[in-house]
């Protein structure tokens, strides 16, 4: 059902900035200030990069050549685990407060800690309701698999809001056709793509997804220099503090693949674009990947969205005489 309070057009923002990989609280405080800045410019939706809170450890091998785990790698993981966040912690409270104060719906990447396992997670904040959900990255890429766990099918939400149907797919998950199809089947119209991919090939990927899903795509990547990390941080890209580890490339794309803002590679910035939700419907006139262009008589996708737990406890109740 169409939301009668839905704005015809509103302003969205994509934040391209460096987080503090040594302090999640500092990163959260920076994010809160950027939410306030974007909202002050009129943005009702604000999207942040992958792993903005907790940090993306670009260039770190975690001391793990094949068949070996070095002591210094174990210590690097301990420090990374310390920088991750619990979802009932002060970092989440800080973002929730900024979203509440501004009314801006916010999507932000974090490193989520659950006991001994870390997850690359996207968090969703509604200004009125606080943290409303999360998406855990299903498939970490290459070396990420050493430090991050795998999300299951229970955290692939699309939220119906007055700003459109909002969801998130993280970095190279965007190359998983079946995941994209699942998002399209949920009617996603605001497709958020937090990422660490700053290559020239990323923008065409985002344009393809916008065209394929007939949705707005908002992709956010950090602009991060080596100097954000301590001098003794192990980095395959060297020790020069001015070396750019991630160069951004954030962008906003409309449902017909037109780039509305970005890409920007020059430094930290906030990109803005007007989101006209009627363009989603206009786009689906001739292509609806999960609807009239889907051919379910030939192809079908089965999605298991049940949570998968390593241990399930069944407790016996002793009968009373």
Swiss-Prot record:
Gene3D superfamilies from the UniProt entry: Carbon-nitrogen hydrolase (3.60.110.10)
Protein's UniProt keywords contain Hydrolase: yes
Keyword Lyase: no
GO molecular function, one term: nitrile hydratase activity
Gene Ontology BP term (one): detoxification of nitrogen compound
Enzyme class: hydrolase
UniProt keyword terms in alphabetical order: Hydrolase
The reaction(s) this protein catalyses: an aliphatic nitrile + 2 H2O = a carboxylate + NH4(+)
Coiled-coil parts of chain: none
Domain (CN hydrolase): residue spans on this chain: 10-277
Temperature characteristics of this protein: Optimum temperature is 45 degrees Celsius.
EC number: 3.5.5.7
pH-activity profile: Optimum pH is 7.0-8-0.
CDD domains with a match to the protein in the record: nitrilases_CHs
Family: Belongs to the carbon-nitrogen hydrolase superfamily. Nitrilase family.
Main function: Nitrilase that acts on various kinds of nitrile compounds such as aliphatic and aromatic nitriles. Has higher activity toward aliphatic nitriles compared to aromatic nitriles. Among the different substrates tested, has the highest activity toward hydrocinnamonitrile.
Protein name, entry field: Nitrilase blr3397
Organism of derivation: Bradyrhizobium diazoefficiens (strain JCM 10833 / BCRC 13528 / IAM 13628 / NBRC 14792 / USDA 110)
């Amino acid at each position: 059902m169409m939301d009668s309070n839905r704005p015809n057009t509103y302003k969205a923002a994509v934040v391209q900035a460096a987080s503090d990989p040594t302090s999640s609280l500092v990163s959260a405080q920076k994010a809160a200030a950027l939410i306030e800045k974007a909202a002050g410019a009129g943005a009702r939706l604000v999207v942040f990069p992958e792993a903005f809170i907790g940090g993306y450890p670009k260039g770190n091998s975690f001391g793990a050549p094949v068949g070996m785990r070095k002591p210094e790698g174990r210590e690097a993981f301990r420090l990374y685990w310390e920088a991750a966040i619990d979802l009932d912690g002060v970092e989440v409270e800080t973002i929730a407060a900024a979203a509440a104060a501004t009314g801006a719906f916010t999507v932000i990447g974090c490193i989520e800690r659950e006991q001994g396992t870390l997850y690359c997670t996207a968090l969703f904040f509604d200004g009125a309701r606080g943290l409303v959900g999360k998406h855990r990255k299903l498939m970490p890429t290459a070396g990420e698999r050493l430090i991050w766990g795998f999300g299951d099918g229970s955290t692939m939400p699309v939220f119906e809001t007055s700003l459109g149907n909002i969801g998130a797919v993280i970095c190279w998950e965007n190359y998983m056709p079946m995941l994209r199809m699942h998002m399209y089947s949920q009617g996603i119209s605001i497709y958020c793509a937090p990422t660490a991919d700053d290559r020239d090939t990323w923008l065409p990927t985002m344009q393809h997804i916008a065209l394929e899903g007939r949705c707005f795509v908002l992709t956010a990547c950090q602009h991060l220099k080596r100097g954000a990390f301590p001098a003794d941080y192990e980095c395959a890209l060297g020790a020069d503090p001015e070396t750019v580890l991630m160069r951004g490339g954030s962008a906003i794309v409309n449902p017909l693949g037109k780039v509305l803002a970005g890409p920007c590679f020059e430094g930290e910035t906030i990109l803005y674009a007007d989101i006209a939700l009627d363009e989603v419907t206009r786009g689906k006139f001739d292509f609806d990947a999960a609807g009239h262009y889907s051919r379910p008589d030939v192809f079908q996708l089965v999605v298991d969205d049940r949570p998968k737990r390593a241990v399930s406890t069944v407790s016996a109740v002793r009968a009373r005489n």
